Design a protein with these regions (language model features):
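Conserved beta-propeller blade repeats
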Residues: 14-28, 45-67, 73-78, 88-89, ...
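Predominantly five- to eight-bladed beta-propeller fold
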Residues: 1-41
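Internal hydrophobic scaffold segments of catalytic domains
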Residues: 1, 78-80
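Hydrophobic alpha-helix feature that most strongly marks membrane-spanning transmembrane helices
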Residues: 67, 81, 94, 117, ...
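Short loop/turn segments that connect beta-strands within beta-propeller blades
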Residues: 33-37, 80-84, 128-132
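Intrinsic-disorder/low-complexity, polar/charged segments
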Residues: 3, 68-69
Length: 136
């Protein structure tokens, strides 16, 4: 792909994207203790893409989204960085395709707001801290 900027000539920029039949790039998640410099791998299951990672309100916890290559199986995990433990909060599947958004908000009590098109329309859902649906 050529990149055009203010230079006289464009520059070529390449990026790796797996073609049909090729393996995906292997993506892993690691936690680093900045005091001890110890690095721990976080096991989020299958070799999925990790499109979104964000800190939750608790500074020891991360929210990690993974999605498979077909992009029809999305999982939301809670990762405790101190304990290096992972729990599944939410899983969505679709026969065709799941859109990845930035519509994830954690509230003060660790419940969270999530948007989904699971019924064909975009709706807002409220889940408790354990991933149980409270309200649409």
């Amino acid at each position: 792909m050529e990149i055009y900027d203010h230079a006289l000539y464009p520059q070529a920029d390449t990026f790796k994207y797996p073609k049909a039949g090729e393996n995906n790039s292997v993506v892993t998640l690691h936690l680093v203790d900045v005091n001890t410099k110890k690095i721990n791998e976080v096991d989020v299951g299958n070799p999925y893409y990790i499109p979104r990672i964000k800190w939750k309100n608790n500074p020891d916890e991360l929210a990690v989204q993974t999605i498979n290559r077909r992009q029809d199986d999305l999982k939301l995990y809670s990762v405790n960085a101190k304990k290096n433990s992972v729990s599944l909060l939410l899983e969505e599947t679709d026969k065709a395709y799941l859109d990845i958004t930035d519509d994830l908000t954690f509230l003060d009590d660790d419940s969270f707001i999530w948007t989904s098109e699971r019924d064909g329309h975009n709706h807002i859902y409220l889940y408790n801290k354990d991933g149980k649906l409270k309200n649409q």
